[in-house]
């Protein structure tokens, strides 16, 4: 290199530093890309995104190529800087060149380009992917040879190169949806997606109408009572039973069909009502909502009775109940709304009905009440106290100061709640 002018050496040194910055920035930019947005842009026809996605299909090959050439230009820059230093300062120039080059490379070829690439990953990656794709085709034999040595070394030390495609977990997907929801003006859409994810873990037992609130018709009642129950039915289908739910469930009666028969038949008897009822559809209490939604569709059912492992009726669930878990309460729903079960007080406290669903309370107030052993607010308090409390009893559960206001029928009707 003694015959090469200093000006030429400086130009070559600058080129090496620029190339080092390019490879460093390209590596950071490509590895910082959001793979879901990258896939979306690629499907939209973005050429840079398509090439970047293609490069990232084989990350080992891409990294090998970038590291080979990044090290090559760094070593070249170090050699040239040493020659320049010795020409200018003699033997002391080696130390001077080492110190200056280390600073320059750290700032201009590492920190600066990687910071820019991390902040503008798409712009940097899509631009560099065009160049990297062409260079990789030219130097692929060299990269392939280096990968052979690398894989051989990994086998010697007992490591396996696992390039299997990673599958996103439901919790990771939940995090992605939550982050995307922060940038979405419509809060309902991400909430619906999160509700769909919840259907994997939520069971019919969590959302069912409890047994004591099931609206049904006792065929042993007189006609006036039967007509009154038909007129005030909460759903378009009601449970038809004899004596009680424990004794004999006769079927599920369509309210509209009952009124049609009443108008068309001159002799409308209880036997006619029983024959008009559909066969009862039973649902195990541990059935996930996702599964039950599919079962409703497959069996062409809209309502079912939830039973426990002993076959005892625990509650009732409808197709509408499951859909409301996704989209929220329907305006036409006659089921009690959580808004009606919670009364805000001027002092910041609130009055909560004992029948309020714990999952709904957690959603509304961002609480973390345990829903594993209890489904309602009444059940949570009873589980904590292990007895039916007297009115005026005060307890603390999960950061909530709870005062029992009304007790009746062996359950807590209302309680005052203050967030501590």
From Swiss-Prot:
Gene3D superfamilies assigned: 3.30.465.10, CBS-domain (3.10.580.10)
Domain CNNM transmembrane: 2-190
InterPro entries per record: CBS_dom, CBS_dom_sf, CNNM, FAD-bd_PCMH-like_sf, FAD-bd_PCMH_sub2, Ion_transp-like_CBS, Transptr-assoc_dom
Subcellular localization, as worded in the UniProt entry: Cell membrane
Membrane topology: Multi-pass membrane protein
Domain CBS residue range list: 208-268, 273-333
GO molecular function, one term: flavin adenine dinucleotide binding
Protein name per its UniProtKB record: UPF0053 protein HI_0107
């Amino acid at each position: 290199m003694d015959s090469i002018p200093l000006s030429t050496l400086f130009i070559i040194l600058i080129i090496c530093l620029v190339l080092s910055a390019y490879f460093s920035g390209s590596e950071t930019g490509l590895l910082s890309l959001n793979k879901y947005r990258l896939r979306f842009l690629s499907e939209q026809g973005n050429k840079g995104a398509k090439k970047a996605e293609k490069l990232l299909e084989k990350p080992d090959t891409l990294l090998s190529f970038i590291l080979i050439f990044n090290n090559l230009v760094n070593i070249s820059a170090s050699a040239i800087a040493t020659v320049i230093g010795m020409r200018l300062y003699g033997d002391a120039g080696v130390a001077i060149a080492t110190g200056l080059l280390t600073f320059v490379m750290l700032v201009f070829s590492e920190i600066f380009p990687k910071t820019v690439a991390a902040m503008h990953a798409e712009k940097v990656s899509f631009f560099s992917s065009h160049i990297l794709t062409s260079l990789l085709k030219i130097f692929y034999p060299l990269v392939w040879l280096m990968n052979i040595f690398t894989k051989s070394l990994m086998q010697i030390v007992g490591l396996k190169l696992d390039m299997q495609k990673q599958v996103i977990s439901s919790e990771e997907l939940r995090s992605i949806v939550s982050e995307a929801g922060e940038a979405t003006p419509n809060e309902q859409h991400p909430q619906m997606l999160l509700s769909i994810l919840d259907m994997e873990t939520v069971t019919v037992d969590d959302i069912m109408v409890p047994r004591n609130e099931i609206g049904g018709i006792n065929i042993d009642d007189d006609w006036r009572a039967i007509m009154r129950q038909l007129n005030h039915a909460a759903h378009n289908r009601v449970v038809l039973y004899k004596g009680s739910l424990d004794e004999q469930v006769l079927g599920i009666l369509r309210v509209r069909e009952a009124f049609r028969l009443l108008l068309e038949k001159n002799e409308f008897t209880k036997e006619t009502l029983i024959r008009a009822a559909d066969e009862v559809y039973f649902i195990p209490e541990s059935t996930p909502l996702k599964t039950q939604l599919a079962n409703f569709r497959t069996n062409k059912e809209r309502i079912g009775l939830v039973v426990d492992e002993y076959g005892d009726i625990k509650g009732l669930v409808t197709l509408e109940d499951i859909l409301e878990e996704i989209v929220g309460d329907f305006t036409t729903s006659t089921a009690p709304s959580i808004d009606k079960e919670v009364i805000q007080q001027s002092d910041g406290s609130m009055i909560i009905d004992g029948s309020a669903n714990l999952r709904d309370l957690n959603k509304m107030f961002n609480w973390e009440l345990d829903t594993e052993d209890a489904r309602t607010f009444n059940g949570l308090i009873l589980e904590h106290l292990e007895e039916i409390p007297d009115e005026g009893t005060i307890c603390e559960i999960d950061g909530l100061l709870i005062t029992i206001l009304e007790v009746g029928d062996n359950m807590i009707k209302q309680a005052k709640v203050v967030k501590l």
